[in-house]
């Protein structure tokens, strides 16, 4: 791994994740508030028992030793091979408007077909959207559908999220 936080779930670890990901200040604060919410909420009683889950032994963020690529041919083979076995690149070429590949907690590949992009559709990784021209849109809508206050694990996600895709489809 190129970077890994210590095990556990503390404000210091969440701050380190935010720093490593070059979050804007509002996201750093969002993460810390989500952690506060996580620490205050009880574990849900739906689903299987997770009584033995000990967050002090879990590493919540690991960045692999790679970076995002613009072309599938540039993605390292050890990352690309599982996707090739699943037939994802072929499916992308055949019918998908766009595809992204995430390895561990980082997006390593994103691509959108030119004809879709020409219509104003944006498909990129969350980190680029968070700090680029769509930053205000991300800020306005991030975790609004399932907010950190929804349940304990939504709060956990809000504190330590990484990776993911941003899609914008203009009206019309």
Map each language-model feature to its residues.
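Glycine-rich and polybasic anion-binding loops at the starts of cofactor/ligand-binding domains
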Residues: 1-172
């Amino acid at each position: 791994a190129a970077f890994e936080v210590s095990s556990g779930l503390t404000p210091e670890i969440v701050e380190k994740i935010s720093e490593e990901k070059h979050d804007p200040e509002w996201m750093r604060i969002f993460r810390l508030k989500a952690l506060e919410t996580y620490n205050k909420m009880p574990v849900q009683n739906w689903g299987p028992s997770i009584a033995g889950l000990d967050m002090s032994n879990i590493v919540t963020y690991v960045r692999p030793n790679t970076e995002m690529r613009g072309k599938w041919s540039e993605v390292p083979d050890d990352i690309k091979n599982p996707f090739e076995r699943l037939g994802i690149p072929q499916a992308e070429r055949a019918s998908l408007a766009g595809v992204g590949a995430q390895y561990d907690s980082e997006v390593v590949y994103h691509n959108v077909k030119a004809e879709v992009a020409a219509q104003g559709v944006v498909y990129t990784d969350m980190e680029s959207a968070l700090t680029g021209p769509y930053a205000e849109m991300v800020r306005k809508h991030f975790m609004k559908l399932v907010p950190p206050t929804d349940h304990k694990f939504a709060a956990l996600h809000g504190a330590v999220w990484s990776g993911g895709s941003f899609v914008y489809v203009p009206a019309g």
